[in-house]
Amino acid sequence: MHRLTVFLLCLLCGTLILASNTEAAPLLQEGKRTLYQRVISHPTAQLYAQASDQSQVVDKGLRPFTPLYVYERGQGWLNVGKGTNKADGWIKADLTTPWNQSLTLLFSNRSQRDPVIFFRDTRALQDICDAPDMSERLVSLQLAVAKKKTGPEVVASEPMTSSVDLDRFYLMPILEMQEPYEGTKFLRVASIDPGQIPGSQYHQGKGGTASDPTTKKAPRTGIAIVMDTTVSMQPYIEQSRQLIKTIYDRLQKEKLAEHVGFAFVAFRNSTAAVPELEYVSTVVSDFVTASNRKELESRLAEVREAKVSTHSFNEDSLAGVYNAIESLSWDEYDSRIILLVTDAGPLPSDDRYRSVAMEPQEMADFAGQKGIWIVAVHIKTPAGASNHDYAEQAYRTLSMKNGSAQYQSIKTSNPKEGARYFAAVAESLAKTMEQVVTLTTQGKMLTRPKDAAPKNPEEDAAQLAQRLGYALQLEYLGRANRTPAPQVVSSWITDMDLAHLARGQRVPNVEVAVLLTKAQLNDLHAQIGAIIDNAERTKKTDSTDFFQGILSASARTARDPNMPTQGKTLAELGVLGEFLDGLPYRSEVMLLTEEDWYRKSIGEQTAFINRLKSKLARYEEYDRDRKNWETFGTFSANDWVYRVPLNMLP
């Protein structure tokens, strides 16, 4: 009996020890099944072993604005962890801010806007917006910011003479949102570059100053011409040869031979449909500078337009763009431009010969992730009149960056005239990038072009090049000087540029993104995959269990796999992750009911499926993008985070 008692006691102790070592999951958000409570840490916050500042500090260098999961709530303290597998320590509750929706901001490019000013409160911001002389006050305020002579109403500003370094992760969480005017939001945000906090384990030194744009290293620009080489494009091919030769001559004369490189990628259409086309897309030459020009010039001399027509008027231009993004040696260049030249739209999503899953919006986001700007030159000929509207919309979307399209249309019935206009665009780009090199090494800035209606295609091309050059110089200086984001604990900004608002125009200051963990992105990928599989199955078989099939495949996330589906949206059924609930965007997928699906025509169903396939392809690229995943000090890959733009959600 005594031995049995000892055995039972030992067993009980072992069980208690095991239980004490088993980590609890974070607290769930109210009303949620899978979403955990989160906060973000403030500067100076530390993690303690116990809920007392007299206990041992277990993390002195806690990165400011680190997202933390809440495991336990005490009196004025929170037990938190960087991941979902264990708690790391206790933090003072007043040194955190609740952040359950995980919305963050990214600065938009500066090609058309002023630096963002961070205001102390909404009253200061509203005073500016309500002022009858708003434009004049903004000019005075920007001058005061530049001279660092602002009043207490301004707490910080985006750097004046460079962009924030795009290669440095910064977090700008949205803490509160108001909409005092239709179409314009006031956002309460925090903003800190964690690498700039003295004493932090992430501290990386002072970095460059935004007020001095001079750098020791001149920027290098890579321009990739992505050329349609189907029937009728020979004049443009020949013009590109002459253009590159002329630019190389000038670069060598001005001692800039190593600072601008050209690459050439050709595209046609499906060789499965028409084998005589020879290729869908091919890299004619990787980047070559003027010093090695013979290599590119000899290869360009071999390029000819196709001898046969393709299976459709639209061509596989997205295959050419994707090939350029993935295959060229961009890493050697600071500024990166794709110059797309075509007289047809991209293959639509319902064309079975399309070789790339991503659609224009997803391709634009993919290029942006790689730091590449796309300039689309769309040649509008009489033969393609019925295609012009579709192609223009597609290429505006493809070349869109933060609300501004780098799109140039050329209306012409004469190929030689069209080729001349194309040369004007490319020449303007090259000259502007040469200016960027020269002025940057002299410590001078390009002037941001004024908003003025162009009088002709050449003037339009020059303005486009100037806007692009201005933005690229700011981006380069941001990287070269390692310019940090403003260090602000709490402040107010507008989502639109104030100077343009004063003129009744809308130019975005910021882009909204949601911080997704790798686990959430994997779930989203699986859920979208299940929707696609069941959509294709029911489309082929005419079966009527579309939603039930999705529920069966998504049993882990669905609120109830046996729930009646009639009249319910996918969001109400809980098929998609709860992290999408309440986000400020309108989701075509989340609002879909089973009745909606069966009311769609075959063509509409196919288009819906293809849009989801495009998102799926983009998520796979996010997963591959190791550079932009942020760990926040957790070793669990499932808890790493990525800033996914709202328009990339399904």
Annotated model-derived regions:
Residues 166-224, 230-238, 250-253:
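Acidic, polar low-complexity linker/tail segments
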Residues 365, 380-650:
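P/S/T/G-enriched low-complexity
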Residues 58-94, 143-177:
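SH3/SH3-like beta-barrel superfamily modules
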Residues 217-341, 346, 380, 384-387:
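Von Willebrand factor
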